[in-house]
Protein backbone atom coordinates (compact mmCIF):
# COMPACT_ATOMS: atom_id res chain seq x y z
CA UNK A 1 0.00 0.00 0.00
CA UNK A 2 1.19 3.48 -0.78
CA UNK A 3 0.90 6.19 1.83
CA UNK A 4 -0.85 9.37 0.69
CA UNK A 5 -1.77 12.50 2.65
CA UNK A 6 -5.34 11.13 2.78
CA UNK A 7 -4.24 7.86 4.41
CA UNK A 8 -5.26 8.03 8.06
CA UNK A 9 -2.67 7.56 10.75
CA UNK A 10 -3.77 4.60 12.84
CA UNK A 11 -3.58 5.53 16.53
CA UNK A 12 -3.72 2.48 18.80
CA UNK A 13 -4.95 3.08 22.36
CA UNK A 14 -4.36 0.33 24.90
CA UNK A 15 -6.61 -0.36 27.85
CA UNK A 16 -5.93 -0.88 31.53
CA UNK A 17 -3.51 -3.45 32.89
CA UNK A 18 -1.37 -3.08 29.75
CA UNK A 19 0.86 -0.65 27.91
CA UNK A 20 1.48 0.29 24.29
CA UNK A 21 3.60 -2.85 23.75
CA UNK A 22 0.28 -4.71 23.75
CA UNK A 23 -0.05 -3.53 20.15
CA UNK A 24 3.35 -4.77 18.88
CA UNK A 25 1.94 -7.46 16.53
CA UNK A 26 -0.58 -4.98 15.08
CA UNK A 27 2.07 -2.28 14.72
CA UNK A 28 4.29 -4.69 12.80
CA UNK A 29 1.45 -5.57 10.40
CA UNK A 30 0.57 -1.92 9.80
CA UNK A 31 4.20 -0.97 9.25
CA UNK A 32 4.64 -3.90 6.84
CA UNK A 33 1.76 -2.38 4.86
CA UNK A 34 3.45 1.04 4.96
CA UNK A 35 0.60 2.54 6.97
CA UNK A 36 1.35 5.35 9.42
CA UNK A 37 0.82 4.17 12.99
CA UNK A 38 1.27 5.56 16.49
CA UNK A 39 0.68 3.82 19.84
CA UNK A 40 0.87 6.43 22.61
CA UNK A 41 1.03 5.49 26.27
CA UNK A 42 -2.46 5.80 27.72
CA UNK A 43 -1.91 7.49 31.12
CA UNK A 44 -4.62 5.38 32.85
CA UNK A 45 -5.40 8.14 35.37
CA UNK A 46 -9.12 8.57 34.69
CA UNK A 47 -11.40 8.66 31.67
CA UNK A 48 -11.55 12.45 31.22
CA UNK A 49 -7.79 12.85 31.73
CA UNK A 50 -6.89 9.95 29.44
CA UNK A 51 -9.24 11.11 26.68
CA UNK A 52 -7.86 14.64 26.89
CA UNK A 53 -4.32 13.27 26.60
CA UNK A 54 -5.15 11.08 23.59
CA UNK A 55 -7.03 13.96 21.92
CA UNK A 56 -3.94 16.15 22.38
CA UNK A 57 -1.74 13.49 20.76
CA UNK A 58 -4.19 13.13 17.88
CA UNK A 59 -4.46 16.90 17.46
CA UNK A 60 -0.72 17.08 16.77
CA UNK A 61 -0.95 14.64 13.85
CA UNK A 62 -1.15 16.20 10.40
CA UNK A 63 -3.97 14.62 8.44
CA UNK A 64 -6.76 12.18 9.24
CA UNK A 65 -6.63 9.74 12.15
CA UNK A 66 -8.30 6.37 12.72
CA UNK A 67 -8.57 5.71 16.46
CA UNK A 68 -8.40 2.08 17.61
CA UNK A 69 -9.11 1.17 21.23
CA UNK A 70 -8.85 -2.06 23.19
CA UNK A 71 -10.89 -2.70 26.36
CA UNK A 72 -10.85 0.51 28.44
CA UNK A 73 -9.12 2.17 25.46
CA UNK A 74 -12.48 1.98 23.67
CA UNK A 75 -14.02 4.34 26.20
CA UNK A 76 -11.03 6.64 25.81
CA UNK A 77 -11.33 6.82 22.00
CA UNK A 78 -15.08 7.46 22.30
CA UNK A 79 -14.42 10.63 24.27
CA UNK A 80 -11.16 11.65 22.54
CA UNK A 81 -12.70 11.14 19.10
CA UNK A 82 -15.30 13.79 19.84
CA UNK A 83 -12.61 16.29 20.86
CA UNK A 84 -10.15 15.89 17.98
CA UNK A 85 -11.30 17.34 14.65
CA UNK A 86 -9.08 15.10 12.50
CA UNK A 87 -10.53 11.77 13.68
CA UNK A 88 -12.28 10.05 10.76
CA UNK A 89 -13.32 6.79 12.40
CA UNK A 90 -13.22 4.51 15.42
CA UNK A 91 -12.39 0.82 15.77
CA UNK A 92 -13.28 -1.06 18.95
CA UNK A 93 -11.25 -4.21 19.68
CA UNK A 94 -12.96 -6.13 22.51
CA UNK A 95 -13.63 -2.67 23.88
CA UNK A 96 -16.06 -0.55 25.85
CA UNK A 97 -18.09 1.98 23.88
CA UNK A 98 -19.76 4.00 26.61
CA UNK A 99 -22.68 6.25 25.84
CA UNK A 100 -22.47 9.90 26.82
CA UNK A 101 -22.98 10.13 30.59
CA UNK A 102 -22.53 6.38 31.11
CA UNK A 103 -20.07 4.91 33.63
CA UNK A 104 -18.25 1.60 33.95
CA UNK A 105 -20.13 0.96 37.20
CA UNK A 106 -23.39 1.04 35.23
CA UNK A 107 -22.00 -1.36 32.63
CA UNK A 108 -20.88 -3.86 35.27
CA UNK A 109 -24.21 -3.51 37.08
CA UNK A 110 -26.15 -4.10 33.87
CA UNK A 111 -24.12 -7.04 32.58
CA UNK A 112 -22.82 -8.54 35.81
CA UNK A 113 -19.37 -9.03 37.21
CA UNK A 114 -16.71 -10.86 35.26
CA UNK A 115 -13.77 -12.91 36.54
CA UNK A 116 -11.70 -9.77 36.01
CA UNK A 117 -13.56 -7.91 38.77
CA UNK A 118 -12.57 -10.58 41.30
CA UNK A 119 -8.94 -10.56 40.09
CA UNK A 120 -8.44 -6.80 40.54
CA UNK A 121 -6.37 -5.67 43.50
CA UNK A 122 -6.47 -2.08 44.77
CA UNK A 123 -3.41 -0.25 46.03
CA UNK A 124 -2.80 3.35 46.99
CA UNK A 125 -0.45 5.80 45.32
CA UNK A 126 0.56 9.35 46.26
CA UNK A 127 -1.11 12.25 44.51
CA UNK A 128 0.16 15.75 43.88
CA UNK A 129 -0.53 18.05 46.81
CA UNK A 130 -0.46 15.23 49.35
CA UNK A 131 -2.76 12.38 50.12
CA UNK A 132 -3.34 9.19 48.21
CA UNK A 133 -5.66 7.73 45.61
CA UNK A 134 -6.50 4.18 44.59
CA UNK A 135 -5.19 2.41 41.52
CA UNK A 136 -6.03 -1.07 40.30
CA UNK A 137 -3.99 -3.96 38.98
CA UNK A 138 -4.67 -7.63 38.36
CA UNK A 139 -3.22 -10.22 40.72
CA UNK A 140 -0.36 -11.63 38.59
CA UNK A 141 -1.37 -15.24 39.21
CA UNK A 142 -4.86 -14.48 37.84
CA UNK A 143 -3.80 -12.33 34.87
CA UNK A 144 -4.13 -14.98 32.18
CA UNK A 145 -7.38 -16.56 33.36
CA UNK A 146 -9.12 -13.27 34.18
CA UNK A 147 -7.82 -10.98 31.46
CA UNK A 148 -5.89 -12.67 28.67
CA UNK A 149 -7.09 -16.26 28.38
CA UNK A 150 -6.63 -16.24 24.61
CA UNK A 151 -2.91 -15.46 24.80
CA UNK A 152 -0.13 -18.01 25.31
CA UNK A 153 1.23 -18.29 28.85
CA UNK A 154 4.73 -17.20 27.76
CA UNK A 155 3.16 -13.87 26.79
CA UNK A 156 0.84 -13.45 29.78
CA UNK A 157 3.59 -14.30 32.27
CA UNK A 158 5.44 -11.18 31.09
CA UNK A 159 2.31 -9.04 30.83
CA UNK A 160 1.25 -10.00 34.36
CA UNK A 161 4.40 -8.60 35.94
CA UNK A 162 4.75 -5.58 33.64
CA UNK A 163 1.11 -4.43 33.67
CA UNK A 164 0.40 -0.76 34.24
CA UNK A 165 -2.16 -0.17 36.97
CA UNK A 166 -4.81 2.41 36.42
CA UNK A 167 -6.73 4.79 38.63
CA UNK A 168 -10.12 3.64 39.83
CA UNK A 169 -12.42 4.62 36.96
CA UNK A 170 -15.68 2.86 37.78
CA UNK A 171 -17.62 6.05 38.50
CA UNK A 172 -16.08 8.15 35.69
CA UNK A 173 -18.76 9.20 33.22
CA UNK A 174 -18.11 9.51 29.50
CA UNK A 175 -18.34 13.16 28.46
CA UNK A 176 -18.99 12.24 24.81
CA UNK A 177 -19.76 9.27 22.57
CA UNK A 178 -17.99 9.84 19.26
CA UNK A 179 -19.34 6.54 17.91
CA UNK A 180 -22.66 8.33 17.47
CA UNK A 181 -21.23 10.73 14.90
CA UNK A 182 -18.17 8.99 13.40
CA UNK A 183 -17.95 5.79 11.35
CA UNK A 184 -17.29 3.02 13.88
CA UNK A 185 -16.79 -0.72 13.92
CA UNK A 186 -15.85 -3.37 16.42
Task: Locate each region found by the language model.
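Active-site catalytic motif of lipid deacylating hydrolases and related acyltransferases
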Residues: 3-63
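Glycine-rich His-Gly loop
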Residues: 13-16, 70-71, 95
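Active-site signature of alpha/beta-hydrolase-fold catalytic machinery across serine-
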Residues: 25, 79-80
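Gly/Ala-rich beta-loop-alpha elbow adjacent to hydrolase catalytic centers
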Residues: 68-73, 77
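Flexible "cap/lid" loop of the alpha/beta hydrolase fold
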Residues: 86-130, 166-171, 175
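Helix-loop "lid/cap" segments that line or gate small-molecule binding pockets
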Residues: 129-134, 138-150
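Conserved serine/cysteine hydrolase catalytic core
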Residues: 153-186
Amino acid sequence: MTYTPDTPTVVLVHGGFADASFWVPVIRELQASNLPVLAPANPLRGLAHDAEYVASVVGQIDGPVLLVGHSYGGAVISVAGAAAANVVGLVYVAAFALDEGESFAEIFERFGATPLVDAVRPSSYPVEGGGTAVELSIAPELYQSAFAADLPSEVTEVLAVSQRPFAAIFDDRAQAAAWKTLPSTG
